[in-house]
Curated annotation (Swiss-Prot):
An example Gene Ontology biological process: fatty acid metabolic process
SUPFAM superfamilies xref list: Acetyl-CoA synthetase-like
Keyword list, A-Z: Fatty acid metabolism, Ligase, Lipid metabolism
Naturally occurring in which organism (per UniProt): Arabidopsis thaliana
InterPro entries xref list: AMP-bd_C, AMP-bd_C_sf, AMP-binding_CS, AMP-dep_synth/lig_dom, ANL_N_sf
Gene behind the chain: AEE21
CDD domains: ttLC_FACS_like
Name of this chain's protein: Probable acyl-activating enzyme 21
GO molecular function per UniProt: ligase activity
PROSITE patterns: AMP_BINDING (PS00455)
Lipid metabolism found in the keyword field: yes
Keyword Lipid metabolism: yes
Family named by the database record: Belongs to the ATP-dependent AMP-binding enzyme family.
Domain of life of the source: Eukaryota
Function: May act as an acid--thiol ligase that activates carboxylic acids by forming acyl-CoAs.
Length: 546
């Protein structure tokens, strides 16, 4: 428009780096990071991140070089989420559960210049590096240790940090769409892919996550989401923007969570359904009461019964749907005021859905992949969940073919199946390869898993299809009972019949297996393992449904 101009006065490329610069000024003397006896202020955190960026730059890193890290949720990772991009680099936090071969695959693909490794994972990191064959120069290893007197042949993190210049000028992105992070998918559907996040997407998603999780200024965030998973759902950047406290955890269990909430007066955290289930079913000796409500964002819907238990313990849980390709969280189940006037069972059912796109996503829909049209809003028609907007990945690193396949017709096509309810809210039903075809009808496992969770004796459950001579496939439930609890197969099946009422009888399990339910490190059920177990059981005859 005539008389206007873009200049440095009115345009700065969006980047989470801005959050840290502001936090050091506005919240400088306030606590930023807590980990055991370690405690920093925002002024100190900014200083440490600048020194880290300077030390990395002194190694001769070029813009967009990769810096890798393998560590639990410790302060060094928080600093790397700023220090690496402030050096112009791209951070890749690797999955701490990867074995040496998976790590070697990730390192060979990303070719990092520097590799920060927590001493707990040093042996597997060294083994993975020994497997590399196509990298001319292996990365420089810097060890993260909690014992400064620990002997190591590698330079330690704090020593490396001390070489940095506190007056270093952070490198900003030239374009806000420049890469800031690489994240490997969990690999539940295929070999893990490497997803590229941009400065712009990270900035927008971080702000959206804070609003979704009902964060207030200066929150206290418990770091329960692994930082290797979708950049920790962008929460490190979020809490920085809000001037809060990041409570780091080396391990996550129910006792640590309750103790941390009370000790640090935690206001917010994120968690997968298994984490929430663990909290809901914690032993009475572990549970602790607190006179405030803790806001929880769940990356996946939990059964209403679990939500009710959490509510009574002092947690307000908002459900969300997402994946690595959409920066972790792509939707949120925003609670409507009128839901509070409904009977509790109906209110919880509505709140247990996956919701709608948050304000940093342009749209979410359930589309027929052939017609490219939206499905009826009937809560029944199962098709593919698709999203688009500014917080969708830039693409798959070094995989143009996969990127083009994922971006079709102006949408990112997930590998997840869902439905749309009459009010427009999305419900995730199953992974595309996990849906069960019963008598020619596509059936998701999510609802029946929720029913199984509501059984008083059931601690965990996963449902897959088992070969069936009559239906093609029928429901096979793998159930883990609570400690000391007892239940028989017939009892579980009858319970599902009663709960389903007049709904689709094909959802009733024909087989119940009592066993552990294998999970990925991020809490997703390893359906491929369960499917093989069900297949190895052979065909089942259809039970008569009374």
């Amino acid at each position: 428009m005539e008389g206007t101009m873009r200049c440095s006065a009115n345009y700065v490329p969006l980047s989470p780096i801005s959050f840290l610069e502001r936090a050091a000024v506005v919240f400088g003397s306030r606590t930023s990071v807590v980990y055991g006896d370690i405690q920093y202020t925002w002024h100190q955190t900014r200083d440490r991140c600048v020194r880290l960026a300077s030390a990395l730059s002194d190694l001769g890193l070029s813009r967009h070089d990769v810096v890798a890290a393998l560590a639990p949720n410790v302060p060094a990772l928080c600093e790397l989420y700023f220090g690496a991009p402030m050096a112009g680099a791209v951070l890749c936090v690797l999955n701490t559960t990867f074995d040496s071969q998976m790590l070697a695959m990730a390192l060979e693909k990303t070719k990092p210049k520097v590799f920060f490794v927590d001493s707990e994972f040093l042996s597997v990191a060294e083994e993975s590096l020994s497997l590399l064959s196509n990298i001319e120069e292996k990365p420089l290893i810097i060890t993260i240790t909690e014992n400064p007197t620990e002997q190591s042949k590698y330079e330690q993190y704090e020593d490396f940090l001390s070489t940095g210049n506190p007056n270093f000028k952070p490198i900003r992105p030239v374009d806000e769409c420049d890469p800031i992070a690489l994240n490997f998918t969990s690999g539940t559907t295929s070999t893990p892919k490497c997803v590229v996040y941009s400065h712009r997407g990270a900035y927008l998603n971080a702000t959206a996550v804070g609003v979704m999780n009902e964060m207030k200024p200066m929150p206290v965030y418990l770091c329960t989401v692994p930082m290797y998973h979708c950049s920790g759902w962008c929460y490190i950047w979020t809490v920085t923007a809000f001037g809060g406290v990041i409570v780091c955890l080396r391990e996550v269990n129910d006792e640590v969570i309750f103790d941390s909430i009370v000790k640090h007066k935690v206001t917010n955290f994120g968690g997968s359904p298994p984490v929430l289930n663990m909290i809901a079913n914690a032993r009475d000796s572990v549970k602790k009461s607190f006179p405030w409500t803790v806001q929880v964002m769940s990356g996946g819907s939990s059964p209403p019964e679990v939500m009710l238990k959490l509510k009574k313990l002092g947690f307000k849980v908002m459900m969300a749907y997402g994946c690595s390709e959409v920066y972790g969280l792509g939707t949120a189940c925003l609670w409507m005021p009128e839901w509070e006037t409904l009977p509790e069972e109906e209110s919880l059912r509505l709140k247990a859905r996956d919701g709608l796109n948050h304000f940093a996503k342009e749209a979410v829909d359930v589309l027929d992949p052939t017609t490219m049209k939206s499905v009826p809003h009937d809560g029944k028609t199962i098709r593919v969940i698709a999203l688009r907007g500014n917080t969708v990945m830039s693409g798959y690193f070094k995989d143009k073919e996969a990127t083009e396949a994922a971006f079709r017709g102006g949408w990112y096509w997930s590998r997840d199946m869902g439905v749309i309810d009459p009010d427009g809210y999305i419900q995730f039903k199953d992974r595309s390869q996990d849906v069960i075809t019963c008598g020619g009808e596509i059936v998701g496992s999510k609802e029946i898993e929720g029913i199984l969770y509501s059984h008083p004796a059931v601690y965990d459950a996963g449902v897959v299809g088992r070969p069936d001579e009559t239906l093609g496939e029928s429901m096979c439930a793998f159930v883990k009972l609570k400690e000391g609890a007892e239940a028989r197969e017939e009892e579980i099946i009858e319970f599902c019949k009663r709960k389903l009422g007049n709904k689709n009888m094909k959802m009733i399990p024909k087989t119940v297996v009592f066993s552990d339910v294998p999970k990925t490190p991020t809490g997703k059920i390893r359906k491929n393992v369960l499917r093989k177990m069900a297949k190895d059981m052979g065909y089942v005859q259809l039970r008569a449904v009374e």
